[in-house]
A protein has these predicted regions:
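Flexible, solvent-exposed short loops/turns enriched in glycine
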Residues: 43-54, 98-118
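Amphipathic, coiled-coil-like alpha-helical scaffolding segments used for oligomerization/assembly
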Residues: 83, 103-152
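Post-signal peptide N-terminal segment of mature Sec-exported envelope proteins
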Residues: 25-54
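Beta-strand elements of well-folded, non-transmembrane domains
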Residues: 30, 72, 84-88, 143, ...
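Sec-dependent N-terminal signal peptides
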Residues: 4-13
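N-terminal post-signal-peptidase region of extra-cytosolic proteins
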Residues: 51, 59-71, 96-97, 137-142
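Structured, soluble extracytoplasmic/luminal domains of envelope-associated proteins
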Residues: 77-106, 110
Length: 152
């Protein structure tokens, strides 16, 4: 009897997941995502048909190295950090419409486009001077317009 209990427990362990603070879980059952995210804590699931995807909902930083065009036609190498956060209640929507690689496919892509559009209106010296704050605000505005309706 004791051996049977251990076997039963061992067979259930692959069907457990822990969702940490600062994350939500999204259940994928037979390839379909549940619409409601799972709160932090212990989650039990059937491992054959179900996966638990973890989505960070805390503030996340990604650093991007790329070349910005300037108004006078110069290229300026820059290393820029982007801070973003996935809205917890929209995590299933983000995974369903964009996929698990949402950071590279959407956040970084939108940033590259917005940064290139904005920096092309400024001189190269402005990118590293007092105009930098204004440039940051314009990039943030463009990114917010695109990302706010998509769960960010």
């Amino acid at each position: 009897m004791r051996m049977l209990s251990w076997l039963l427990l061992a067979s259930m362990l692959p069907g457990c997941a822990v969702i940490n603070q600062g994350e939500v879980g999204v259940i994928r059952r037979w390839g379909k995502l549940d619409e409601q995210p799972v709160a932090p804590g212990l989650v039990f699931f059937e491992p054959v048909s179900t996966q638990v995807l973890r989505v960070p909902v805390r503030l996340t930083t990604v650093t991007v190295d790329f070349t910005l065009p300037s108004k006078e036609g110069l290229n300026v190498d820059a290393q820029i950090s982007i801070l973003y956060r996935v809205e917890a209640e929209k995590a299933p929507q983000v995974l369903g419409t964009i996929g698990e690689n949402y950071e590279e496919e959407l956040v970084v892509a939108v940033f590259r486009s917005a940064a290139a559009d904005v920096s092309a209106h400024f001189f190269a010296r402005d990118l590293y001077s007092s105009e930098r704050g204004r440039i940051e605000k314009e990039i943030k505005k463009l990114m917010t317009e695109v990302l706010s309706g998509r769960g960010f």
